[in-house]
Structure formats: structure tokens, C-alpha cells
Amino acid sequence: IIGPNGGGKTTLVKTILGLLKPIKGKIQFYREGQSTPSLRIGYLPQYTTFDRKFPISVRDVILSGLHGKHFVWHRFGTSDQQKADDIIHLLELDNCAHNAIGEISGGQRQRALIGRALVCDPEILILDEPNTYIDKKNQDKLYELLKQVNTHCAILLVSHDIGTVLRNVRNIVCVNHNVHYHPVSEVDEKLIEDSFGCPFQLVAHGQIPHRILENHTD
């Protein structure tokens, strides 16, 4: 999902999550082609605020993603603990799993929050600007991880990084008060201009597309 600030990306995501009610129309979920009232959803918000001094470990943050299926004071069983450990290993957080969440780097913290979204075995994973706090090297590793996850889980990803998005996704939703939905192969400068409301060029270095804004008055 791409589009300018204020275009409706966050509103769309919150409506899918059930945090907002649509003014008209409805959100419909499907499982294996059959309509279903809901699906398991994992969610990484764009901004996550917390008390850095709060004594909770990386492992416990990831386990907290299971509270949606248990009571808040539920004691996690062996299978839950193993699931968290598998996510920790998958995200390469083994060396800081027992560190306090406020003591680790921004990139590690972002991966821990992604782990919290993954641990519930979501059928849909919604990530709002997941590259936040993650350097370029680890961004590439993140997208490789998401490709693995995508074999058994649908992913909705909100991003301003058009170049990275075009390299790693199959379909684009352009949101700017209207919605344009296309396979990546059909995305061109005209579509992006209509979505962002200003002219720009797509320039490719090999297989890597970039965007360059042209002169405009806004």
C-alpha cells in the first residue's frame, strides 16, 4: 500500500483491523475462497511508544502477541514458549532475547515487534512502515524473511519506499482518497503520479527502480 501522507493509508488499515467502521461498503474476509467473518491478523503499527525503563524482555514482548488468544494473565505453556523461541531464531534475536526491550538497538526492537505480530500465526500480516529503524542491509534481510512468511500468510505492507516495494511485492494498492490496485508489472509513472498528485520519474539501475520527483508547485 503506497500513497501520499493524508491520502487514507492509515484509515484503510484501521478499517481492515476493525478499529474504524466504514462509512459505506464493508470489509469482507475470505479463507480458501469461502467468506468468513474474521481472520487472525498480526499488526505492526508505524509508531509504537513504550516506557524504555519498563522491565520486559524481548522474549516476553514477542510472547505478548499471544494475549489475543489467551486471558491477559494466562501463563504461557510449552507450545507457546517454543513458538516464541522459533520466532526469536527466525528473526536472529537469539543474542538479545533476554535483554530488556529498552536496552537493545532500534533495529532489534523493530524486529522484536515484528515477532510479536508473527507469533500468533496470522493469516494476514499488516506492517505499517516496517523499515523504520532498520538499516539497508537488514532491510534486505527483512524482505527475504517476509517472502518466507508469505508462503503461508498474506501480507499487507504500507511503505513510502517505492523502489524497495516494487522489487519485493506482487501487487500495489495506491491510496490517495481513491484506490488504484494493480500488479507490479502494470505500475508506471502515470499511475504513481495519479496516486501522489505530483509528477515524477521512475529510474532503474539494473533491476532496482527509484523515484525522482520532478519540479512541481506543491
Task: For the regions a language model picked out, list residue spans one by one.
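Helix-to-loop junction immediately C-terminal to a conserved catalytic motif
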Residues: L17
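Conserved ABC transporter NBD signature motif
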Residues: G25-I41
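Conserved ABC ATPase "signature" region
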Residues: L63, T78-C96
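Conserved ABC ATPase signature
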Residues: A100-I104, Q108
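Catalytic Walker B motif of ABC-type/P-loop ATPase nucleotide-binding domains
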Residues: L125-E129
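H-loop (His-switch) and adjacent beta-strand-loop-beta switch element
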Residues: R170-S185
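ABC ATPase nucleotide-binding domains
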Residues: E186-D218
